[in-house]
Amino acid sequence: TPPMSADRPKLDIATFLLSSIHDMKNSLGMMAAHLEDALAEPAENGIPSGSPARGKTAQALYEVQRVNNHLIQLLALYKIDQSFYPFDPQERPLADLAREALARAMPLATSQGIEVDFDCPEDLYGWFDHELVFGVVLQALHSALHYTRTHVLLSACAHDSGVMITVEDDGPGFPDFLLAQGNAAQCGISFETGNTGLGLYFANAVAGLHQAGNKS
């Protein structure tokens, strides 16, 4: 093996990682689409309804979407930190955002027999960056679908001169110790549960970009 030249350019690890994350994200997106297609097939042509295979396919879809969302969040956080994220707040209808997020989450909800509803006035508008807020809402929906028992509700309403988006489920909720930690929980990780706090950190960063005075 020839010796490394002193003039050889140094590897830009950040560029390498970004390129790798993009590649993984695209591959996971294709895998998620294939799994969604498999779950959408009629039972007589695809995976039998109520079979263990359907449940395992739904769980695989959840995990693929979860990892893909985390990669997208990492990319967005890096760009925000480096001040080159193309932040693009525009006035948009909240109902369209809700329907788009629900459409992405419905294959998993349907396969698990979970009822999903949304409550949002058609004339409710807000100023926000679509991709960032969509990512936060989708993350919340996926978490709700994972922990709920039977029902998830996505709602949006006018609130205090702005808008409020809420995702509710009938699961056990956050444990008391996590609620007591508040924002501090975003900074820690748990080897026991595998929780990195990335979703909460991302949501907090997105809220910070959508501030008006002391409101976000």
Placement of each model-derived feature along the sequence:
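Conserved C-terminal segment of the DHp
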Residues: 30-49
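Short alpha-helical segment of the dimerization/phosphotransfer core of two-component systems
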Residues: 62-70
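Conserved micro-motifs of the catalytic ATP-binding
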Residues: 82-87, 125-128
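Conserved catalytic submotifs in the C-terminal HATPase_c
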Residues: 88-91, 115-124
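Short beta-strand/loop element within the Bergerat-fold HATPase_c
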Residues: 151-161
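Glycine-rich/acidic phosphate-handling loop/turn and adjacent ATP-lid/helix
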Residues: 168-194
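Conserved glycine-/histidine-rich ATP-lid loop and adjacent helix of the Bergerat-fold HATPase_c
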Residues: 202-215
